[in-house]
Amino acid sequence: MMKRLVVLRRREPAVRFSCCGVRYGECRRNHAASTGGHAVDGCREFIAAEDGGGGNSTSAVGVAAAALKCAACGCHRSFHRRVQVYEVAWDDDCASGDTSSSSPSSSSSLSSE
């Protein structure tokens, strides 16, 4: 005789992560690589350099090159640690006003975590 197996599903609140933007942190350029050592300059955050306004820097290529150079340490943006900033969005069925269900699985879905 076969036994019955009952599987109960809980409705977990859906969580959506969306990438809001990218921030560049501290500089990781090794200035002592040629001597076999390790020395960083201490730049804590990437700050885009503004163009000086002289000569050929007003072209689109000059502005783009200036935006990739750090104003604080002079390094390229690729030497700075890339940090992605995420936004968390929760989808709650209970918050939408759907309280007509009296099943224990739907009422305990928020308190399980």
Swiss-Prot record:
Main location: cytoplasm
Alphabetical list of PROSITE patterns matching this protein: ZF_HD_DIMER
Low complexity compositional bias, start-end: 100-113
GO molecular function per UniProt: DNA-binding transcription factor activity; transcription cis-regulatory region binding; zinc ion binding
Assigned keywords, A-Z: Cytoplasm, Metal-binding, Zinc, Zinc-finger
GO BP term (any one): regulation of DNA-templated transcription
Cell compartment(s), UniProt: Cytoplasm
One protein family per Pfam: ZF-HD_dimer
ZnF ZF-HD dimerization-type span: 24-83
Segments traversing the membrane: none
Extent of the signal sequence: none
Gene Ontology cellular component terms for the protein in this record: cytoplasm; nucleus
Region Disordered, residue ranges: 93-113
Subunit structure: Homo- and heterodimers.
Function: Inhibits zinc finger homeodomain (ZHD) transcription factors, by interacting with them to prevent both their nuclear localization and their DNA-binding properties.
Protein name as it appears in the record: Mini zinc finger protein 2
Biological source species: Oryza sativa subsp. japonica
